[in-house]
A protein has these predicted regions:
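Pre-Walker A adenine-sensing motif
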Residues: 3-23, 44
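Pre-Walker A (Motif I) flank of P-loop NTPase domains
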Residues: 23-29
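Conserved P-loop NTPase motor cores
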Residues: 29-49, 62-64, 90-202
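Compositionally biased low-complexity segments enriched in polar/charged residues
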Residues: 2, 73, 81-83, 216
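Conserved GTP-binding G-domain of TRAFAC-class P-loop NTPases and closely related GTPase folds
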Residues: 171-249
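Conserved P-loop NTPase mechanochemical-coupling segment
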Residues: 77-94
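Short secondary-structure boundary/capping segments
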Residues: 73-77, 196
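AAA+/P-loop NTPase substrate/partner-engagement loops
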Residues: 52-74, 95
Length: 249
């Protein structure tokens, strides 16, 4: 499959926002989990449930371990939406060019009172690849601009990482809409507590909540929702898919 991204998109008349269970789109998801913690499994199942709401899905994979599953998401009939591209090579210049083209075309649709295309970008364990998260003033990483402007373009993004602290702070603590944590080390967990504590939940509370969730086994995750107020910020994703609110300790 080609690693080049075609940049032309067509207008559509559907609403550019939709909901799926707890989640409201467009959205930026961050998903953190150590190997074998169920991180990619959760993302794969989420994609299976929401994919038909999108016109295009682009998936960057850091490894080929899960390639067969993600490739299987595409419909055998190429004329049916969504168009799905699975890429194994990350090129910052290619992504930036695609994003700027998408930005221009989406804004043209919005200005013409038409609904923008629904596009989903998935970055699965590619944080270590050159130019993805690192940045400098002369040449910022495309993900910085994407994370800051996705809402205005009807664009949704999923970023997965084995480590919380490896993701830059604007994304891990500010710009995301939903943060899902399957399993992390204590250094990451302490930082999560520090960056997400509020008037109702202390950093220690957050750590204890996560430990309790994880004690129920793989498949149980903690959700931090920036789509809710501070009192309803923390949620339990159960192994059976049910999502329940966590009240202050």
């Amino acid at each position: 499959m080609s690693n080049k991204l075609e940049t032309s998109i067509k207008a559509f008349t559907e609403k550019d926002q939709f909901s799926h269970g707890k989640y409201n789109f467009p959205a930026l998801f961050t998903v953190f989990g150590t190997p074998k913690s169920g991180k990619s499994y959760y993302v794969f199942n989420l994609l299976k449930e929401i994919k038909d709401n999108f016109d295009r899905i682009i998936i960057y994979l850091g490894t080929k371990d899960a390639a067969a599953g993600f490739l299987g998401l595409a419909d055998k009939d190429a004329k049916k939406k969504p168009q799905i591209n699975v890429l194994f090579k990350y090129d910052a210049n290619d992504l930036y060019a695609y994003f700027k083209k998408l930005e221009t075309e989406q804004l043209q649709l919005i200005e013409a009172n038409k609904k923008p295309k629904r596009v989903l970008l998935v970055f699965d364990d590619i944080l270590g690849l050159h130019g993805f998260m690192t940045t400098n003033r002369a040449k910022p990483s495309p993900i910085h601009e994407i994370s800051a402007n996705y809402r205005h373009l009807g664009l949704s993004v999923i970023i997965t990482s084995q480590s919380y602290m490896d993701v830059i702070k604007p994304i891990r603590a500010l710009n995301f809409k939903y943060c899902i944590i399957t399993s992390v080390g204590m250094k990451d967990l302490k930082l999560i507590g520090e960056e997400h504590e509020n008037l109702y939940f202390s950093g220690k509370d957050i750590i204890e909540i996560f430990k309790n969730i994880r004690s129920h086994g793989i498949g149980n995750c903690m959700l931090i929702s920036n789509d809710d107020d501070d009192l309803n910020r923390f949620w339990w994703i159960h192994k059976n898919g049910e999502i329940t609110n966590i009240k202050p300790l």
